[in-house]
């Protein structure tokens, strides 16, 4: 198995390094990751400037000022030849639960892999301590994919409780929960009197029902949530058509 490994915390982050070491025990791994922390960069793709790479002494490749999406795009199309069999993103320092996935660079890296036609996993730890647990879970999932390929065409978003491996209760297939809208902005002034703004914390949980990723992780289970690139709200198509007709702007012009 040939694995392209990326993240949004940066090429030297502990999560990606622990995971790379674990994966190299049974797979060929190429790390292509941002040269710095790019958390919250979502699916941003660099189009207005060239990208440079730096190969680290251990063979990992850092994309200078690159986003997670840049890294996977370059990794699949230029830097890893032959092309990888799968894209893995993580281990993220902190969870990517509920609608956090909208902003997540970790999830975006996996989404880019899927968009380029490859199976993809995004792996996040609900904390900053037990990276070895998340690495072990990831290896189990990848070995399962080797034995029995999963042909859903979906991304697997994996969130792991920050616990020792022997305290993990199991794995649940979940849906994304949701949060209340975030509304905190912190304003400061620089020495010249100009305002500086800091984005505040995420909103509190709104939907953390028993079948959500929030609930599973809180109860000590690994949450695996299938995600997809296609954002079409199919159930709303007929509703929108009816509304356009009633509003007098539908149909042929």
Curated annotation (Swiss-Prot):
Keywords: Cytoplasm, Hydrolase, Metal-binding, Nucleotide-binding. It comes from the Bacteria. A divalent metal cation binds at residues 8-9, 39, 92. It is found in: Cytoplasm. Its main location: cytoplasm. Its EC number is 3.1.3.5, 3.1.3.6, 3.6.1.11. Its cofactor is a divalent metal cation. One of its GO terms (molecular function) is exopolyphosphatase activity. The keyword Phosphoprotein does not apply. It catalyses: a ribonucleoside 5'-phosphate + H2O = a ribonucleoside + phosphate; a ribonucleoside 3'-phosphate + H2O = a ribonucleoside + phosphate; [phosphate](n) + H2O = [phosphate](n-1) + phosphate + H(+). GO terms for cellular component: cytoplasm. Binds 1 divalent metal cation per subunit. Gene3D superfamilies: Survival protein SurE-like phosphatase/nucleotidase. Nucleotidase with a broad substrate specificity as it can dephosphorylate various ribo- and deoxyribonucleoside 5'-monophosphates and ribonucleoside 3'-monophosphates with highest affinity to 3'-AMP. Also hydrolyzes polyphosphate (exopolyphosphatase activity) with the preference for short-chain-length substrates (P20-25). Might be involved in the regulation of dNTP and NTP pools, and in the turnover of 3'-mononucleotides produced by numerous intracellular RNases (T1, T2, and F) during the degradation of various RNAs. HAMAP family: SurE (MF_00060). Belongs to the SurE nucleotidase family. This is 5'/3'-nucleotidase SurE. It comes from Serratia proteamaculans (strain 568). The gene is surE.
């Amino acid at each position: 198995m040939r694995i392209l490994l990326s993240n949004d915390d940066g090429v030297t982050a502990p999560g990606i390094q622990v995971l790379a070491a674990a994966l190299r025990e049974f797979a060929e791994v190429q790390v292509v990751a941002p040269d710095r922390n790019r958390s919250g960069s979502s699916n941003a793709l660099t189009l207005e400037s060239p990208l440079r790479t730096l190969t680290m002494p251990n063979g990992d490749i850092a994309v200078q000022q690159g986003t997670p999406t840049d890294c996977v795009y370059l990794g699949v199309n230029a830097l890893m030849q032959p092309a990888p069999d799968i894209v893995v993103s993580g281990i993220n320092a902190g969870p990517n639960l509920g609608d956090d996935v909208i902003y997540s660079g970790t999830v975006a890296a996996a989404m880019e892999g899927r968009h380029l036609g490859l199976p993809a996993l995004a792996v996040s730890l609900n904390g900053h301590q037990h990276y070895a647990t998340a690495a072990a879970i990831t290896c189990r999932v990848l070995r399962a994919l080797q034995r029995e390929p999963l042909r859903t065409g979906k991304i697997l978003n994996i969130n792991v409780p920050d616990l020792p491996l022997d305290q993990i209760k199991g794995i649940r297939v979940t849906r994304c929960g949701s949060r209340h809208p975030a509304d905190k902005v912190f304003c400061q002034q620089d020495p010249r009197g100009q305002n500086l703004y800091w984005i505040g914390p995420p909103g509190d949980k709104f939907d953390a029902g028993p079948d959500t990723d929030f609930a599973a992780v809180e109860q000590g289970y690994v949450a695996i949530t299938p995600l997809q690139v296609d954002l079409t709200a199919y159930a709303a198509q007929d509703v929108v058509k009816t509304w356009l007709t009633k509003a007098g702007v539908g149909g042929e012009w």
